[in-house]
A protein has these predicted regions:
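Secretory-pathway/luminal and periplasmic proteins that interact with or process carbohydrate-rich
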Residues: 79-86, 146-155, 167-171, 187-193, ...
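Short, functionally critical alpha-helical segments immediately adjacent to catalytic or ligand/cofactor-binding
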Residues: 60, 69-81, 132-149, 181-184, ...
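Substrate-binding clefts and substrate-entry loops adjacent to catalytic sites
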Residues: 102-115, 168, 172, 189, ...
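An acidic, Gly/Ser/Thr/Pro-rich helix-cap/linker signature
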Residues: 21-130
Length: 275
């Protein structure tokens, strides 16, 4: 999931489930956070991108991408430096959470979620029985991640992830996703045209990152392919599988709204810091 990373063990897990509950229940939580600002003006398109891709070739091969596959998909690859701006202006971290969530959940989306719940009831029930995740939660994640498949992203994954593999923060992370995208293409699971998504590389109905797709996507419609782009059944079941593997426990709350004690510093807090 976008950032399709959700519940137990990470901030993303908690946020996605929080958003999932919001689509169904319409409740909200609060937070404030910012990230350092670096813009695409700091990055000038030049031969460094091709040099970077050439240097990454051996890493890709070590990660299971054939030389032929790598060469095919990088030969004419060009950078998209607009993703550098996106990397540094993520609304989850720069927008107060009340404002962020109010933009994700409104009456129209809740109503559409109810319609999708009824429309896909059979598949959702099967997925729920298989993975132990309520249909309502699966649909809620679907709504938050792509507005039920209507907005799944327009960025070509290879271009976006290739750029992020060579420029900006978290290059090591994005290289992992870049290579995973190539392995998906190498296996023939999806086509290059299908692999369009968010600036960060998330794609499909519920915005899986490529490495998450490799680990947790399932073929639920029985056609022999794990297609999270064109198959609603595969996407919804894969979402349930994701939450199941993340430690989903039906009936347990995703978290609680709290007030930070006066004088308590939250500088440096993150997913690995606990109190």
């Amino acid at each position: 999931m976008r950032r399709f990373s959700c519940i137990v063990g990470s901030v993303f897990l908690a946020m996605t489930q929080a958003q999932a509950e919001l689509v169904i229940n319409g409740s909200t939580i609060s937070s404030n956070a910012t990230v350092p600002v670096v813009t695409s003006e700091d990055y000038t398109p030049n031969n460094n991108f091709q040099s970077c891709l050439a240097n990454l070739r051996s890493q890709a091969i070590a990660a299971g991408v054939s030389g032929a596959t790598y060469d095919r998909y990088t030969q004419n690859l060009t950078p998209d430096y607009s993703v550098i701006d996106k990397l540094n202006y993520q609304p989850e971290f720069s927008t107060p959470i009340w404002d962020y969530l109010s933009g994700l959940v409104d009456e129209e989306r809740v109503e559409l979620g109810k319609q999708k719940l009824a429309q896909h009831r059979d598949v959702l029930n099967r997925a729920s029985q298989t993975y132990g995740v309520p249909p309502e939660t699966i649909v809620a994640v679907w709504g938050v991640e792509s507005n039920f498949g209507d907005i799944s992203g327009k960025y070509p994954l290879l271009q976006a992830l290739g750029t992020l593999s060579c420029e900006g923060r978290r290059q090591s992370y994005f290289r992992t996703e870049f290579f995973a995208t190539m392995r998906i293409l190498q296996r023939g699971d999806l086509t290059e045209d299908q692999l369009k998504g968010s600036w960060a590389g998330a794609f499909g109905h519920t915005q899986f990152m490529p490495s998450t797709y490799e680990r947790l996507a399932v073929d639920f419609d029985g056609d022999g392919r794990r297609d999270l782009v064109s198959s609603t059944a595969d996407a919804l079941a894969s979402t349930a599988n994701f939450l199941n593997k993340a430690g989903w426990q039906t009936g347990m709350p995703w978290g609680f709204e709290v007030k930070v004690p006066q004088g308590m510093s939250i500088d440096g807090e993150g997913r690995r810091s606990k109190h």
